[in-house]
Amino acid sequence: MFEIHPVKKVSVVIPVYNEQESLPELIRRTTTACESLGKEYEILLIDDGSSDNSAHMLVEASQAENSHIVSILLNRNYGQHSAIMAGFSHVTGDLIITLDADLQNPPEEIPRLVAKADEGYDVVGTVRQNRQDSWFRKTASKMINRLIQRTTGKAMGNYGCMLRAYRRHIVDAMLHCHERSTFIPILANIFARRAIEIPVHHAEREFGESKYSFMRLINLMYDLVTCLTTTPLRMLSLLGSIIAIGGFSIAVLLVILRLTFGPQWAAEGVFMLFAVLFTFIGAQFIGMGLLGEYIGRIYTDVRARPRYFVQQVIRPSSKENE
């Protein structure tokens, strides 16, 4: 039996990218939710290279009287998951909660995640109820969730919601992983012994626009496919075998037709030959592109460059920069 340790301190990690409109409300509501826990807490806000006034607002929030906010400023935009990993490297709590800055997942749900974690779960995920996103975002999210479930075998309902709670040993395990393409909910479930999901409210976005454009969602899907599994390479081998068998069968058929109908038929079959040729060429290019993705990931990981660069850390206990 594993001993269940009660949560003593909660760390809330929030990546921020051009969210100056939502920051005052985010800080107020998150602080109120954490105060209601009756536990020690800290709120880590990571500025992911914002071009608006977000970074300055975070510094002011950390330097305010009786503040519980730790501001981490990255030197440029590295992406949501890299920013969260930067926050993970500075947490001091034994339960870490991730939250988006857009307030679509309300901070008021934090006490429910803490209560569920106190039951002994390593990871507490969430499922968005009455989701208030566009049809495109919902459809893309369903496709990505199904892809993840099929490739990882982990039957979690919603990997896209970042409102999640992780025990400290899960976060420490993730910090020891050095691959460049990191998808935190999946990585956490790899190390979790006990994981659960709970339904949470999902609100409309009040401030700004989503930072996930169509191309960023496509890139995310490529990242998921290439960093989670080698199944596409196996499928590519299977496709190559099918094409080889199909090509040999067509060649035999063409010889038979040539012998049966004579040379006149061969001229009329030119377009068919071109169609078959283009099919094979297309399959080859798809395979080359897929192999290139994997080789590119390997090349990036081998270089072992840092996932992010922290420019400044401002803690509430001191106004001196780290």
Swiss-Prot record:
GO MF annotation list: phosphotransferase activity, for other substituted phosphate groups; undecaprenyl-phosphate 4-deoxy-4-formamido-L-arabinose transferase activity
Keywords, alphabetical: Antibiotic resistance, Cell inner membrane, Cell membrane, Glycosyltransferase, Lipid A biosynthesis, Lipid biosynthesis, Lipid metabolism, Lipopolysaccharide biosynthesis, Membrane, Transferase, Transmembrane, Transmembrane helix
Regions that span the bilayer: 236-256, 270-290
BP terms from Gene Ontology: 4-amino-4-deoxy-alpha-L-arabinopyranosyl undecaprenyl phosphate biosynthetic process; lipid A biosynthetic process; lipopolysaccharide biosynthetic process; response to antibiotic
Membrane-related topology note: Multi-pass membrane protein
One annotated Gene Ontology cellular component of this protein: plasma membrane
Pfam families: Glycos_transf_2
Stretches assigned to the Cytoplasmic side: 1-235, 291-322
Domain of life: Bacteria
Enzyme Commission number(s): 2.4.2.53
Cell location: Cell inner membrane
Enzyme class: transferase
Cystine bridges: none
Catalysed conversion reaction: UDP-4-deoxy-4-formamido-beta-L-arabinose + di-trans,octa-cis-undecaprenyl phosphate = 4-deoxy-4-formamido-alpha-L-arabinopyranosyl di-trans,octa-cis-undecaprenyl phosphate + UDP
Periplasmic side: 257-269
Family matches, as SUPFAM superfamilies: Nucleotide-diphospho-sugar transferases
Role: Catalyzes the transfer of 4-deoxy-4-formamido-L-arabinose from UDP to undecaprenyl phosphate. The modified arabinose is attached to lipid A and is required for resistance to polymyxin and cationic antimicrobial peptides.
Similarity comment: Belongs to the glycosyltransferase 2 family.
Protein name: Undecaprenyl-phosphate 4-deoxy-4-formamido-L-arabinose transferase
